């Protein structure tokens, strides 16, 4: 469960969870086996600081999605300020064995006129960057190597043994794919009863002309980084836990 000690207020679930970006909403999808979860969650909660947690329940898993402001902690002596930075943490808690799970994060297929999108991944980061004359946006999350290195904390411990498949995909059935350069899809290794998996997604944007505002480095985050920021902030006295 995401952030079990953080107070929350239950909301009506009427809007699909999304991060609003200058190039349209960044939306999220989950498919368990061949079944896609509904766009609207079964439950939605408001947390302090303008955050939300959405929750879906199925017979084989519980899925949660945190949306939150995020401070990437870029050194101001080396990097210029970002316009904004937002993060998501997706979590699945497994109740029965699952052979295939996919999690996706994507911008609209048709971007605004003048916008150009491209793959921008690097070591430990799967990312796309979208820019036009005024704005640069990077959306990033864990690549396969980062997923293996998170084994034991954010993903099942046995996934550390999959590190060789990161460099040889000939027999691999899991990994990260760019969705026509407007998003990414994570296909996970098989999950067993009692497993959990957390994946972060960061969206950071800045003026296109400011090369010191490093949206790429801002996207280098773990789910632990994001969750630690949430729990470090004092909770609102008015927030009521209604789970």
Protein language model regions, located:
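An extended acidic
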Residues: 1-66, 149-158, 226-243
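Intrinsic-disorder/low-complexity, polar/charged segments enriched in Ser/Thr/Lys/Arg/Asp/Glu/Gln
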Residues: 51, 85-89, 181-183, 196-200
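Short, solvent-exposed beta-strand/turn "edge" segments of beta-rich domains on protein surfaces
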Residues: 67-85
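Acidic (Asp/Glu-rich), glycine- and aromatic
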Residues: 81-129, 196
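Trp/Gly-enriched beta-strand surface patches
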Residues: 112-193
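Short Pro-Gly-centered flexible turn/kink motifs
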Residues: 189-207
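Short, Lys/Arg- and Gly-enriched loop/turn segments at beta-strand edges
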Residues: 205-216
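Glycine/proline-rich low-complexity spacer/linker segments in large multi-domain proteins
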Residues: 216-229
């Amino acid at each position: 469960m995401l952030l079990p000690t953080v107070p929350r207020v239950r909301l009506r679930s009427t809007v699909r969870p999304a991060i609003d970006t200058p190039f349209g909403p960044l939306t999220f999808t989950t498919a368990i086996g061949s079944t896609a979860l509904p766009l609207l969650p079964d439950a939605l909660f408001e947390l302090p600081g303008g955050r939300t947690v959405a929750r879906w329940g199925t017979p084989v898993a519980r899925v949660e999605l945190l949306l939150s402001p995020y401070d990437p902690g870029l050194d101001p002596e080396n990097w210029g300020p970002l316009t904004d930075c937002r993060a998501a943490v997706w979590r699945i808690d497994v109740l029965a064995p699952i052979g295939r799970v996919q999690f996706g994060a994507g911008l609209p297929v048709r971007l605004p006129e003048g916008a150009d999108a491209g793959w921008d991944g690097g070591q430990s980061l799967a990312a796309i960057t979208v820019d036009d004359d005024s704005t640069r946006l990077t959306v990033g999350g864990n690549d396969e190597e980062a997923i293996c290195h998170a084994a034991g904390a954010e993903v099942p411990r046995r996934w550390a043994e999959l590190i060789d498949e990161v460099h040889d995909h000939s027999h691999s059935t899991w990994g990260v794919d760019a969705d026509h350069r407007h998003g990414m899809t994570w296909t996970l290794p098989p999950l067993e009863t009692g497993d959990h998996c957390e994946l972060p997604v960061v969206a950071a944007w800045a003026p296109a002309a400011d090369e010191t505002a490093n949206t790429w480095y801002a996207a280098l985050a773990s789910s632990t980084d994001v969750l630690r920021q949430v729990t470090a902030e004092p909770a609102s006295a008015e927030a009521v836990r209604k789970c």
